[in-house]
Amino acid sequence: MGLLSIIRKQKLRDKEIRCLILGLDNSGKSTIVNKLLPKDEQNNDGIMPTVGFQIHSLMIKDVTISLWDIGGQRTLRPFWDNYFDKTQAMIWCIDVSLSMRFDETLQELKELINRDENRIGYECAVIVVLNKIDLVEDKSELHRRCLLVESELKCLFKPDIRIELVKCSGVTGEGIDNLRDRLVESCHFTQ
């Protein structure tokens, strides 16, 4: 391997962004990851819940992003801290169709934020995805739920922390392009 090859590989690695996808079980994390992937890499045979973690790489606007899809089952949550080393972004996925789980998901996020070794919001950009918008038929109810979550997030995070909020559907793909854009922008914010 020549020196130029080594330099090129290092430049690619330097541009690589590590992004964790976290949230409660069945919030649609794996489905969102699947939609973020190029069409020829998407799984169209049905998405299974993640046990442990899965890593996928994709290129968005000349930036290589390593997506770490971490399982959200209650038994896996205590291990989430172990994944934050060298992480530039976190996507926190909320199932907006199940308002009865808002308290649980916000409590888990609060506990994660309060462990300051993660540096969430400072060294690690935060994107909160309100997923499954396609399952809330009443658009005024969807708007109300989004405002509720946004209000709660403002209470969780310090005012100097920038949070991106994205509404999408991992199934229909609505909002996925916006998520791609926010992901790249957030990663530049932390560099």
Curated annotation (Swiss-Prot):
One GO CC annotation: cytoplasm
Any one GO biological process: tubulin complex assembly
Sorted UniProt keywords: GTP-binding, Nucleotide-binding
SMART domains (alphabetical): ARF, SAR
Coiled coil segments of this chain: none
The UniProt record lists the keyword Membrane: no
CDD domains hit by this protein: Arf_Arl
Pfam families (UniProt xref): Arf
Binding site for GTP: 23-30, 69-73, 131-134
Entry keyword Lipoprotein: no
MF (Gene Ontology): GTP binding; GTPase activity
Additional detail: Present with 468 molecules/cell in log phase SD medium.
Function of the protein: Implicated in yeast microtubule function.
NCBIfam families per UniProt: small_GTP
Protein name as annotated: GTP-binding protein CIN4
Organism: Saccharomyces cerevisiae (strain ATCC 204508 / S288c)
